[in-house]
Every structure is written in C-alpha cells, then in structure tokens.
A protein has these predicted regions:
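A short, Gly/Thr-enriched small/hydrophobic beta-strand-prone motif that recurs across taxa
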Residues: 20-41, 125-141
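Beta-strand secondary-structure signal
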Residues: 29-33, 83-85, 121-123, 132-134, ...
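Structured interaction patches on ligand/partner-binding surfaces of diverse proteins
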Residues: 19, 68-69, 90-127, 185-217
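Extracellular and analogous surface-interaction loops
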Residues: 123-129, 170-173
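Tryptophan-paired
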Residues: 47-93, 145-202
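Sec-dependent signal peptide recognition
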Residues: 2-8
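N-terminal ordered "arm"
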Residues: 18-21, 32-60
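C-terminal motif of bacterial Sec signal peptides marking the signal peptidase cleavage site
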Residues: 13-16
Length: 221
C-alpha cells in the first residue's frame, strides 16, 4: 500500500485594496476581492466554496455579517479597529455534510484599523481547519472486485468511503485508523486489519493507495 499526502485544495485568498486617502469622501470603506485557488485531487469535479465575512468591533461584538456569496466589492465601515473573520458557513456543521463524510472548512481572522476618510488595506490567507482522507485503487480493480469500502475511524466518528470520495476530520482527534474491505467477483470477502496514521496536519489530503497485495509500499509527504 502506498500512502501519498497532497496539499489539499490550495488556500483561499482574501485581498483588500491598498490603503490611500479619499479627501472628498465622508466615512470609510473596506474594499474586498475574494478568490479561491485550488488543486484538483482524487476527482476532477469542480470545487465551489464561498467565504462569508463576520466583522467584530473592538469589544468583540458583531459589527457586520455578510453571508457567503453575498460579499460586495466595497464594504462601508465606520472608523475604528475591527477583527475581520473570513470563513465558510459550515464552522459548526462540516462533520455532518455529505452523509457524514464531512467537507472542507476554512477560517481565518485578522485585525484591521480603519481611519476616517480612508480605504482600509488588508491581506490575509484563509486556510483549511480540517484534513481529508481519500482512497486510490488500481485501474482494473473493478474488473476483479464487485465491491469495496474504506472504513476510517477518528475520534468518535466512523466513516466509510469509496474511491473518488473524501472524508474530512478534525486534527484535534489525533489521527485516524483505516481498513479496506473488498468482495471479489466470486463473492469472497476480505477485510484488512486496521492501520493507525497519527501524524496529521490541517489542510492536507491523505490519499491511501493500494496494490493487490494490500500491503504498504511507500509513503511520500
């Protein structure tokens, strides 16, 4: 078996325009340009993830909330110091998505000070807060086996995936244990003994690849 680790789906970028004077304008604005850069992995299906914006004032109270997909190019602001949080809307629900397989979750925050009559400047990267596990099988696997599933256990979650699917987990749960179960065309079944992988990091996809011997060959990071 070969385990390959990829950097997962790149990093969202949150970029605001350079600060400059607006002598004839009252109030303040913060200009935002949200973009997503990603590297397709496991499947070529397009990835469409929007960021929401939550702005907190100096006392930690919510000053503004802008839902995902609704972030304008220019956000009117009052002068002061704020914490801008860029995140996906699934901070509390990502584990339940996709029938329990989970989904990617992104979050970052940055303090910004807005001066009266000026445009604010802010540049921040919004990384994934969780990690993913995927499965890769030999090209002719389906010709020899009628079914398969990879069982992944992490923390209190037990998730099953097939090739081409990803399951997402929390780094705080301390890694994962995985085991592949297969049934060949004659109806004979085999389940691999569970293997522990403990050194996990946020923002990565752990792609588990098998040969026909179901043995670990190498592992690249």
């Amino acid at each position: 078996m070969k385990r390959i680790i990829y950097i997962l789906l790149g990093i969202f970028s949150l970029i605001a325009c350079q600060q400059h004077e607006l002598p004839e304008q009252d109030g303040c604005v913060l200009e935002l340009n949200l973009s997503c850069a990603y590297v397709p992995v496991v499947t070529t299906r397009a990835i469409d993830v929007d960021l929401a914006i939550t702005i907190l004032d100096a006392e930690g109270k919510v000053y503004k909330r802008i839902p995902a997909g609704k972030v304008p190019d220019v956000i009117p602001m009052r002068a002061g110091t704020f914490t801008l949080c860029a995140h996906t809307d699934n901070l509390d629900t990502w584990k339940e998505a996709n029938n329990g397989r989970g989904e990617a979750c992104y979050y970052a925050s940055e303090e910004v000070t807005i001066q009266f009559g000026e445009r604010g400047y802010l540049s921040m990267s919004v990384p994934m807060t969780n990690y993913a596990v995927g499965l890769e099988l030999p090209e002719d696997f389906d010709n020899l086996f009628a079914s398969h599933q990879l069982s992944i256990v992490s923390g209190d979650r037990d998730v099953e995936i097939q090739e081409g699917e990803n399951a997402y987990f929390d780094v705080a749960d301390g890694g994962f244990t995985y085991a592949l179960s297969v049934t060949n065309n004659d109806g004979d079944s085999h389940t691999q003994e569970g293997v522990l992988f403990s050194e996990v990091e946020k923002g990565k996809l752990y792609l588990i690849s098998y040969d026909y011997g179901l043995r670990a060959v190498s592992h690249e990071q």
